[in-house]
Amino acid sequence: MLFRSHLNRNKRSVALDLKHADGMEALRRLIAKADVMVWNVRPAAMARLGLSYDDVKKINPKIIYCGLYGFGQDGRYKDKPAYDTIIQGASGMAALHHRSTGEPRYVPMVVADKVVGMTAVQMIVMALYRREKTGEGSSIGIPMFENMVKFVLEEHMYLTTFDPPLGGTGDPRLLDPQTKPIPTKDGYICISANTNAQAFGMFDAIDRPELKTDPRLVSVQARFANVSYYLEVRNAAFASKTTAEWLKLLEAHDVPAMPYHTLESVQEDPHLQDAGFFLTKDHPTEGKIREMRLPNVWSCGTRKEWSAAPKLGQQSVEILREAGFDDAAITRMIADGATIDGQLKR
């Protein structure tokens, strides 16, 4: 899958058959030297392999043991398998599209996988900091279902936040079908005018200053209570000029706005070009590929050159050597199927 070339750079790959004694021994040696162990199968499978937290901490008491799995272990779904689209549907995320358009739909990206992965990173950093202070390792569980339910309902639990509920679910501003890129003379534009200054600036930009005294639009609270009317007025105003003309006019009134990009046009965005965001690199096996620079910056160092995403088992031999296996043992493991050498052509 092509996305792995973006996600797996600067990593090394060792492939082990954990049902083979030598493969399991290799993993145990790696665990003994590791700071963090991340796994993403059902917890019962880890227990069957002899890799539960109790098993692993006997090998390395200070390890951070992080499991990403479908469902929390206190409920009836605990043994169910899970994938991104299953979790999107079960968490209520697909229902957001249903509310807006009348038809449920998955977000066309692996958003649940990404959110849960980022959550895991946060938890691992917290656990490493705790270990720095206490000297103790820990076990972390990251259930996809519960994390995505929380992710969705932070905005959309809405008035059912109260007990008893004061109304229904779903933020009406976000779920209104008019909350979308706005058509212009030659395309679309994206606008967010939330504060009074921004909304009034937009009214001036569209040459509708009288809207500033419309009781339905005069304040943040009024626009919230009349969100459909506000969006209708806003969206109807932009067909008369091009996107570029509107961007210039809105910027003059300090109204937050950006062009609508396609997946193709965003790669030509001038700001990203200024920042050198996209890079072309020579991949060791795939020829020239385009990559994205790490966008975040920090004061303690500079961005480093990256190594290409590895093939499965590409560094098996070097990693097994580091784990203490000699070349004869590694050759035997390859022949027996306990590992694979991704450097070999097949």
Tell me what each language-model feature is.
Residues 1-2:
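Short, small-residue-biased leader/transition segments that mark boundaries at the very start
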Residues 34:
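An anion/phosphate-binding loop that grips the pyrophosphate of nucleotide cofactors and donors
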Residues 47-189, 193-194, 201:
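Active-site-adjacent "lid/gating" segments in soluble enzymes
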Residues 173, 177-253, 257:
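Aromatic-enriched alpha-helical interface/lid elements that frame and gate functional surfaces
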Residues 218, 285-332:
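Flexible, small-/acidic-enriched active-site or ligand-binding loops
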Residues 252-306:
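A glycine-rich dinucleotide-binding beta-alpha-beta segment and adjacent secondary-structure elements
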